[in-house]
Amino acid sequence: MTSLPLGVKVEDSAFGKSAGGGAGQASSAAAATAATMGADEEGAKPKVSPSLLPFSVEALMADHRKPGAKESVLAASEGAQAAGGSAQPLGVRPGSLGAPDAPSSPRPLGHFSVGGLLKLPEDALIKAESPEKPERTPWMQSPRFSPPPARRLSPPACTLRKHKTNRKPRTPFTTAQLLALERKFRQKQYLSIAERAEFSSSLSLTETQVKIWFQNRRAKAKRLQEAELEKLKMAAKPMLPPAAFGLSFPLGGPAAVAAAAGASLYGASGPFQRAALPVAPVGLYTAHVGYSMYHLT
């Protein structure tokens, strides 16, 4: 009883193995056939590696800062264009639409240090500090388009009073001469011709000098006198209230005013006559006052 099932199992397993082997062989054969067909098709097409395409991800992400990267990209783009047979438009250079030009190699840090700047030639420093002016076109050099020259503002002319050309110089009087002239002026402000001649000879001065000094001294005395009179007028002005507030009252004082007001209000006589109440004075004066705020002189 035990041998039969075993035989059946063995047969089943053998059959399964044979069936599975046949299916695997068939699938491998189909894959080989597809591979050969794909290889034939790929062989018929031109082979272009993805790294040679100028717009591939590898080409765009490539590090162009490395030496020779730009040349490799240009060569790859030219190879791709030759393989594809595509025509470039006019005015477009091969590889011009690729990645931007690689920056120049960075200078060493010591080039921008203080020592490096000091070691630079003077010509380079002068050229860097004062760049040349751009050339002007002919129409800009024409005087028609050039701005007018700036006008220099001259200083304003002096507006002081000009003296006469034939003016005589000022006489430098000595202290003794000034004292004698002041003493003589206090005695007499106007001198006669004889007195002036005698006095000028005693002071070693000319008659014209003495005459002019007396004229100036009289004008000065007049100014001083006018200023003194103005001060006296200001000091003599009384500090009185205006005439509008100086109300006049009849003689008799405020009591008479109150009595007159009561008589006119309640009558001259009567059984119900009240005693007059004291009234405060309305004005400042109890008699007729004719003073005003300013005195006329």
Swiss-Prot record:
Residues 13-50, 77-107, 129-169 are annotated as: Disordered. Pfam families: Homeodomain. There is a cross-link at residues 9, 127 (Glycyl lysine isopeptide (Lys-Gly) (interchain with G-Cter in SUMO)). Residues 166-225 bind DNA. Residues 25-38, 77-88 have a biased composition (Low complexity). Gene3D superfamilies: Homeodomain-like. The keyword Cell membrane does not apply. GO terms for cellular component: nuclear periphery. Residues 160-169 have a biased composition (Basic residues). Keywords: Developmental protein, DNA-binding, Homeobox, Isopeptide bond, Nucleus, Repressor, Transcription, Transcription regulation, Ubl conjugation. Belongs to the Msh homeobox family. This is Homeobox protein MSX-1. It comes from Propithecus coquereli (Coquerel's sifaka).
